[in-house]
UniProtKB/Swiss-Prot annotation:
Residues 717-727, 788-828 are vacuolar. Induction: By low phosphate. GO terms for biological process: engulfment of target by autophagosome; intracellular phosphate ion homeostasis; microautophagy; polyphosphate biosynthetic process; polyphosphate metabolic process; protein localization; vacuolar transport; vacuole fusion, non-autophagic. One of its GO terms (molecular function) is inositol hexakisphosphate binding. This is Vacuolar transporter chaperone complex subunit 2. The modification Phosphothreonine is found at residue 620. PROSITE patterns: SPX. It comes from the Eukaryota. Residues 627-636 have a biased composition (Basic residues). The chain crosses the membrane at residues 694-716, 728-748, 767-787. The gene is VTC2. Residues 1-693, 749-766 are cytoplasmic.
Length: 828
């Protein structure tokens, strides 16, 4: 879509006159005349045109950012007025909750529109400047002029997180003191609600991508139901946020941005953010074993990282964390096993690289002197030893750093629902794999160049040393008791959410604002982004192709798709209820019939949801169970032994196959081309190579048999039994021809199955079994015939009273005589 059309469609009508006059600036550039190649004097661009354009551009900048500053200050004043109405208990009791909430809703909506206003106008200015430089390359670029003017406009670098925090505080007052608030507010837990510690709890985590255009709207939607979470100086064991409320962010114009939806990447300015800037330094070895284990879903695949807040020059607290995700394959539930140590900077090098126990001994000594319990000391000592041994055993070293800003939403004291949004994510290489030109000093745990106490330290990064993730990552954590019957699906649409938050969470996650990416991992994405071309990576994450497409959706289209999805879910549920009733009626009459269990019903429902919403490439543990047909199937003939050997029937006859034919309704025809075959065939290279490797092995068997055939045939005249040798040569020649034809036919059949994306089984054991049987029979026949001929020759010599030569030792002669009796004439 052209930007001019996009701007016209997204303009907020009350502020229409305050947006950039994009079309007017385009007319100043005489774009149409330049493209037509006109030689008219009016179409020529001269110094006067340049000065007029710059003057008009400056006027538009003043108009746009003057309005933005005015609106921002107006919002802050109105918020201050609301805060004055709630500064005492008496004022809160006398407050008109409905009117107060209406004003809050207006402020929240205007904040969203102002963020959109800022983003659209900045994009417009950037595009018009780029257009000028492209049309008139002989004239100086006005990009530097734009940057200078933007720095002079204070509202350009204005952060919107203070607005969100203040609005969040006012929403909390409504939640805490009024039961007459609107349903979203009233449904939320009270500010002081606390979860009982007596109940065993676990959590489910769901990951989403959020486009920067939608980031502010997503935050404001969440803010209506959950307050922004502000952390104290020291995080708790369950918090993976860090210990700072504010951080000074030194931004690079191409790398790190602010926490608003219009990042400072575009602005090129430093901004004061109310969201913490988190630095996470991940460990791995040269073979990327931790990455491969995590991506290949090996259970309990751990990750190791160093984490701190803000700039390292400010001497923040640094935590070394070993985090292991333990998943229950039966239920799909997961819980973290977290081992965390707080380290001092001066001891990190020795602890990581040298196995130094000095810091461990000092820490334990201080804690012992302060009266810490013996059990706690033992546990801490075990944690030190566990992490240090883990580093040494796996030869781990710092590999890359992730820098991002985080906004968290959670009701304090109630962690049943928690939402975090990580924005402006940047991955930075910090490995020392290259011995000659290491990125990081091998004897230092971090890059000293970007952690130096200088302005804009990220400017030291070279091309290829960093990668910026194009979207923000939203994570929703849902906590429930261990006996809860939550679905094992990795998609949030298939999970039963708490009643208090289910409706708005479903509305948000099914909207056009977010895209769900199951099992997304920042650690995995960082390795794939920075080291994707490395041959040591066994596999790449399934979501990489989605990064090449625009995840934004048209709101109307998303709404229509959601309506269709809900209708389909209702139809599926109705069919399931009918099937359940029928199974309950028929069960007394047919004891052999197996009733449909509740668990299977949930799986079928989940599969229906997945089909309606489009499946992801993420493989889940429940996938084999969810591929059950929901229609009445025709009977298929029973598999015979030969059909199974030939690969025409699956060996698992008790398992329903996707290939089974279903009865179609009247008037409905089976499509010739299935949707699953519409796109290009994306098959992993190892599948093709496995097929070719099998074919090559068959060719080697064919070659060996052909050598054996012609060796026997060429030595027939020299053989003791020429007739037998001649027969064997013909048998082996036929077996050679069979091997060649069989290997080629099976190879082509498997290629066809792969290209058609068929679920047909690839096993075909008839060939190997037949070759084995023929070889066994020929060996037995050769053995028997040879003994019979030997017995016949022996008998002829005895009849002629000639001496029979004995070629075997005296001990084995009884066995020889026995074989002669068994297979030929007696030697007596």
């Amino acid at each position: 879509m052209l930007f001019g059309v996009k701007l016209a469609n997204e303009v907020y009508p009350p502020w229409k006159g305050s947006y950039i006059n994009y079309e007017g600036l385009k007319k100043f550039l005489k774009e149409d005349s330049v493209k037509d190649g006109s030689n008219d004097k009016k179409a020529r661009w001269d110094d006067s045109d340049e000065s007029k354009f710059v003057e008009e551009l400056d006027k538009e900048l003043e108009k746009v950012y003057g309005f933005q500053l005015k609106k921002y200050n107006n919002l802050m004043e109105r918020l201050s007025h609301l805060e004055k109405q709630t500064d005492t208990e008496a004022a809160i009791k006398a407050l008109d909750a409905d009117a107060f909430q209406r004003v809050l809703e207006e402020l929240l909506s205007e904040s969203t529109e102002l963020d959109n206003f800022k983003r659209l106008n900045f994009t417009g200015f950037a595009k018009i400047v780029k257009k000028h430089d492209k049309l008139y390359p002989k004239y100086p670029s006005v990009k530097s002029l734009l940057e200078v003017r933007l720095k002079e406009l204070p509202s350009h670098s204005e952060e919107y997180s203070p607005l969100l925090y203040r609005i969040s505080f006012l929403y909390n007052i409504l939640r805490s003191n009024f039961n007459t608030a609107s349903e979203p507010l009233a449904s939320a837990s009270k500010f002081s609600s606390i979860v009982s510690n007596d109940i065993d709890m676990n959590f489910r985590s769901f990951k989403f991508w959020v486009h920067n255009d939608n980031l502010m709207e997503v935050k404001t939607r969440i803010l209506r139901h959950l307050p922004v979470l502000v952390y104290a100086n020291v995080p708790s064991e369950n918090d993976d946020l860090v210990n700072r409320f504010e951080s000074d962010i030194s931004n690079n114009d191409e790398i790190v941005g602010s926490s608003s939806s219009t990042s400072s990447v575009e602005h090129g300015l430093g901004a004061r953010s109310f969201d913490p800037l988190i630095n996470t330094l991940y460990f791995d070895n040269e073979h990327f074993e931790l990455y491969n284990d995590k991506l290949l879903k090996l259970n309990s695949a751990p990750t190791l990282r160093l984490r701190w807040t803000g700039q390292l020059s400010d001497k923040p607290d640094i935590f070394l964390e070993k985090k292991t995700l333990i998943e229950d394959e039966a239920t799909g539930k997961s819980e973290f096993d977290l081992t965390k140590l707080q380290l001092k900077q001066k001891f990190i090098n020795g602890f990581i690289f040298e196995g130094d126990k000095k810091f461990k001994e000092q820490t334990l000594k201080k804690l012992k002197e302060s009266g810490t319990a013996g059990r706690d000391l033992e546990r801490l000592e075990e944690d030190f030893s566990e992490i240090q041994n883990f580093i040494i055993k796996n030869e781990l070293q710092p590999v890359f750093r992730t820098v991002y800003t985080r906004t968290a939403f959670q009701i304090p004291g109630d962690d049943k629902i928690r939402v975090t949004i990580d924005s402006n994510i940047v991955f930075i290489k910090e490995d020392s794999f290259d011995r000659e030109r290491p990125i990081r000093d091998p004897n230092t745990w971090h890059r000293t160049d970007i952690d130096a106490n200088v302005a804009n330290p990220l400017k030291f990064l070279r091309g290829g040393e960093y990668a910026k993730f194009p979207y923000s990552v939203m994570e929703i954590k849902v906590k429930s008791s261990l006996d809860s019957s939550m679905s094992a699906s990795s998609m949030i649409s298939n999970v039963k959410l708490p009643k208090k938050h289910g409706q708005w969470l479903n509305d948000l996650t099914n909207s056009h604002l977010v895209k769900e990416i199951p099992k997304f991992s920042i650690f995995v994405q960082g390795v794939a982004s920075l080291y994707g071309d490395d041959e040591k990576l066994d596999i790449l994450p399934f979501w990489l192709p989605d990064l090449e497409t625009d995840i934004r959706q048209d709101p109307k289209q998303a709404y229509e798709e959601e309506k269709k999805k809900l209708l389909k879910q209702k139809e599926i549920q109705k069919k399931i209820d009918g099937m359940r009733r029928l199974s309950n009626l028929k069960e007394p009459q047919h004891q052999a019939a197996v009733p449909v269990s509740q668990e299977e019903n949930e799986r079928i429902t989940s599969q229906g949801d997945l089909e309606a919403d489009g499946s992801s490439d993420e493989e889940t543990e429940q996938e084999p169970h969810s591929k059950r047909s929901k229609k009445v199937r025709r009977r298929k003939p029973k598999a015979t032994f030969l059909r199974i050997l030939a690969g025409r029937d699956p060996k698992l006859m008790g398992v329903d196959s996707e290939e089974e034919e279903i009865e179609l309704p009247p008037g409905v025809k089976k499509p010739l081309n299935l949707l699953k075959n519409a796109g290009p065939v994306n098959v992993e290279a190892k599948v093709w190579l496995a097929n070719e490797r099998t074919f090559n092995r068959w060719l080697s068997v064919t070659s060996l048999l052909s050598v054996l055939t012609f060796s026997i045939y060429n030595s027939v005249k020299k053989a003791e039994y020429p007739t037998l040798a001649n027969y064997m040569a013909y048998v082996y020649f036929g077996l050679t021809i069979f091997c060649a034809l069989w290997s080629y036919s099976i190879y082509m059949k498997r290629v066809d199955i792969i290209q058609q994306r068929s679920g047909q089984h690839l096993d075909a054991p008839l060939g190997p079994v037949l070759v084995s049987i023929v070889l066994f029979v020929t060996l037995v026949v050769n053995f028997v015939m040879a003994f019979r001929n030997a017995a016949k020759s022996r008998q002829e010599l005895q009849i002629q009273n000639l001496e029979v030569p004995e070629r075997i030792p005296e001990v084995l002669r009884p066995l020889q005589n026995y074989l002669f009796k068994l297979m030929g004439p007696s030697s007596d």
